[in-house]
Swiss-Prot record:
GO BP terms, alphabetized: antibiotic biosynthetic process; lactate catabolic process
Family matches, as SUPFAM superfamilies: FAD-binding/transporter-associated domain-like, FAD-linked oxidases, C-terminal domain
A Gene Ontology molecular function term of the record: D-lactate dehydrogenase (cytochrome) activity
Species annotation: Chondromyces crocatus
Transmembrane spans: none
Induction: Encoded within the chondrochloren biosynthetic gene cluster.
EC number annotated for this UniProt entry: 4.1.1.129
The protein's name: 1'-carboxy-chondrochloren decarboxylase
Protein role: Oxidative decarboxylase involved in the biosynthesis of the antibiotics chondrochloren A and chondrochloren B. Catalyzes the decarboxylation of biologically inactive pre-chondrochloren A and pre-chondrochloren B to yield mature chondrochloren A and chondrochloren B, respectively. Cannot decarboxylate free L-tyrosine, 3-chloro-tyrosine or a number of chlorinated and non-chlorinated analog substrates containing variable N-acyl chains.
Matches recorded under Pfam families: FAD_binding_4
Species lineage: Bacteria, Pseudomonadati, Myxococcota, Polyangia, Polyangiales
Catalytic activity: 1'-carboxy-chondrochloren A + FAD + 2 H(+) = chondrochloren A + FADH2 + CO2; 1'-carboxy-chondrochloren B + FAD + 2 H(+) = chondrochloren B + FADH2 + CO2
């Protein structure tokens, strides 16, 4: 292997960035090559630009020397591949140093940030300013990148949950080293650059999400006003067959605009993994979790197979009362228990949580936490990531890092029509195949929009156990293939599945290939990432 181009590129990177921001350290590279499932791609170096101008310079150097780059924001894309590139030999270009908040407008409710800004940082910024605005947060670690998640089209909680639909004015460094501004942002002094999604002419923003056509170095994100009043609601389903009827009800409510916030369902396997770890001793070392033990663990939330929840975000108590009445009328006949928790109920729950848990096993502290620290209010939470430690035998450390701690976690995220029939079919496939492979099917169903349900399947295991990586990936692929055969395709892919989609029946691959060859003729930017190159026609065509 000729290493001279790489060595020359590294020397040029050091000249631009400084030695401290170009790392070939073996331990740093090994950490960047590690995900929450087995990977094989190797990383020769990690470079860390601190500005868009330095990103431009790095891209030009990479192109000059024919060295591929793989951009990451903070690298916490856990469950989908973390920081590991989609091709072997790519240099990781970390944007974590680019963590400035560049513009903020309280009146028009937007913020412009760099890709290194985390959820924790942005929420603290808003709180420190006494802002009335909030961010739609995700279930990932608060230290994950806001821009990175949006560029992978992740969903959040609350209003603006479809985060990709609430951005504009993106700044992108193209693979030739030039800089592009989308929408009205391309015009100096444009007054609507940060508040008008489309601009004038072809709308280009989507080209730079789930793609390798450019590096996003700045993004404007629309925020939502923090509600003057809020109330959470949750319900239990003892019989999982009721999920289908409840799906139809939630869809009809969402089509009417109620509630404005997202609604979610979580199955029992998902809930137990968020609340604790696998009971290895009680299960006598066997997997998957025995039904009797699952039933015992369910008591923490009243024995239900599924738990659902959402929030009413309102300008007045009268509005809350009106929305509550509509939601109650729709859901009550179809669920086992429907509860609404406002300020007064949360206060009572706080007083009664110990005696109630002692007498019934039901944990009211969860109710209090759900009201006071609801993600629907733009408050990040870490419990979802702690579920990555479900099958680990050691307790999660205070500072979680699933990559470092050899947690096994693979996310599968099919998009499904919001009808009971479709959601029920998809859930049965996931449950049956996961259990057949001896894994617990941890499932969330997120209703962030009116017509489509996003199902997130979490397959958890311990990477330190021999053979588990292979078994987990076989389970993942089995579920992936069976869902795809029914037309339930993922809205987001891990690095291992970039070529796993069914064959397309249109010229999509031809167009994507033409764009890639035009913008990145040297193929130096994240080769293989969401470019579906197996569908490209030959270059001479």
């Amino acid at each position: 292997m000729n290493t001279q181009p790489l060595e020359r590129a590294l020397a040029a990177f050091r000249e631009v960035l400084g030695t401290a921001h170009v790392s070939t350290d073996e331990s740093a590279r090994a950490a960047a090559e590690t995900a929450t499932f087995a990977t094989t791609h190797r990383i020769p170096a990690i470079i860390s630009p601190g500005s868009a101008a330095e990103v431009e310079a790095c891209v030009r150097i990479a192109r000059e020397h024919g060295v591929p780059l793989y951009p990451v924001s903070t690298g916490k894309n856990w469950g989908y591949g973390s920081r590991v590139p989609t091709s072997d030999g790519a240099i990781v270009l970390s944007l974590a140093r680019m963590n400035r908040i560049l513009d903020f407008n309280e009146e028009l409710a937007y913020v412009a940030i760099e890709p290194g800004v985390t959820m924790r940082q942005l929420v603290a910024y808003l709180n420190d300013r006494g802002s009335r605005l909030m961010l739609s947060v995700t279930g990932s670690t608060p230290d994950s990148s806001v821009v990175g998640n949006i560029c992978d089209r992740g969903f959040g909680a609350g209003v603006n949950a479809e985060r990709i639909a609430h951005i504009c004015n993106i700044e992108v460094v193209l693979p030739n080293g030039e800089r592009l501004n989308t929408g009205f942002g391309r015009f100096p002094g444009a007054q609507t650059a940060s508040i008008h999604r489309w601009g004038i002419g072809p709308q280009l923003d989507g080209l730079f999400t789930q793609s390798n056509l450019g590096i996003v170095t700045r993004m404007t994100i629309w925020l939502a006003p923090r509600p003057r009043h809020h109330e959470i609601f949750y319900f239990r389903l003892r019989d999982e067959r009721r999920v289908e009827a409840v799906t139809d009800i939630i869809r009809d409510l969402k089509l009417q605009g109620l509630p404005r916030a997202s609604v979610s369902l979580w199955n029992d396997y998902k809930l137990v993994s968020m609340k604790g770890q696998y009971p290895w001793q009680e299960a006598a070392g066997k997997t998957p979790l025995p039904e009797a033990l699952l039933a015992k663990l369910r008591r923490a939330w009243g024995g239900a197979a599924w738990l659902g929840g959402g929030a009413i975000l309102a300008a007045s108590q009268d509005q809350i009362a009106a929305e509550r009445a509509v939601i109650r009328k729709a859901l009550h006949p179809h669920v086992d228990k429907l509860s609404f928790v406002g300020q007064r109920a949360a206060r009572v729950a706080r007083l009664l949580q110990r005696p109630v848990q002692r007498l019934t096993g039901f944990d009211l502290s969860e109710v209090v936490r759900a009201y006071e620290q609801s993600p629907h209010l733009g408050i990040p939470m870490e419990r979802n990531i702690r579920s990555a430690y479900w099958r680990k035998k050691a307790p999660p450390p205070e500072q979680t890092d699933p990559d470092r701690d050899r947690c096994g976690a693979i996310w599968l995220a099919p998009a499904v029509p919001s009808t009971g029939k479709h959601v029920g079919t998809a859930l049965r496939i996931v449950r049956e195949r996961a259990l057949a492979h001896a894994f617990e099917p941890g499932i969330s169903v997120i209703f962030a929009t009116e017509r489509c349900a996003n199902i997130v399947v979490a397959l958890m295991y311990d990477r330190e156990l021999p053979g588990e990586d292979g078994r987990a990936m076989a389970c993942y692929q089995d579920i992936f293939d069976r869902l795809a055969a029914q037309g339930y395709l993922p809205y987001r892919l891990g690095i291992q599945s970039q070529s796993a989609l069914p064959a397309a029946q249109s010229s999509y691959g031809t167009v994507v290939g033409a764009l890639k060859r035009a913008l990145d003729p040297d193929d130096i930017l994240a080769p293989g990432r969401y470019d579906f190159r197996h569908e490209w026609p030959p270059a001479d065509n």
